[in-house]
From Swiss-Prot:
GO terms for biological process: translation. Belongs to the eukaryotic ribosomal protein eL30 family. GO terms for cellular component: cytosolic large ribosomal subunit. NCBIfam families: PRK01018.1. It comes from the Archaea. This is Large ribosomal subunit protein eL30. One of its GO terms (molecular function) is RNA binding. InterPro entries: Ribosomal_eL30 (IPR000231), Ribosomal_eL30-like (IPR039109), Ribosomal_eL30-like_sf (IPR029064), Ribosomal_eL30_CS (IPR022991), Ribosomal_eL8/eL30/eS12/Gad45 (IPR004038). Keywords: Ribonucleoprotein, Ribosomal protein.
Amino acid sequence: MIDISRELQVAINTGKVVIGFEETKKALLTGAPKLIILAANAPKWARDDIEYYAKLAGVPIFVFPGSSIELGAAAKRPHKIMALAVIDAGQSEILKLAEQHA
């Protein structure tokens, strides 16, 4: 089992991760990230929007099993995070989340 918080930290430190709903949406429209992570309590409108663009781009979505506050804490940020996009996983194995939950 992958430790989501640890792998997210490794991805942030060694790869490229964009944080926030708008930034994630921009990444989907322009750069095709490798994985999208959504907080379990993301509002329906936001989830629908991200899921639509992710489906068009063929990008897998992982629903983080916690709130936006917990996702922010997992990313070592002092704020809520509703969505984030992994552009480059770096040395992490975070992309295996998409395989496990496909």
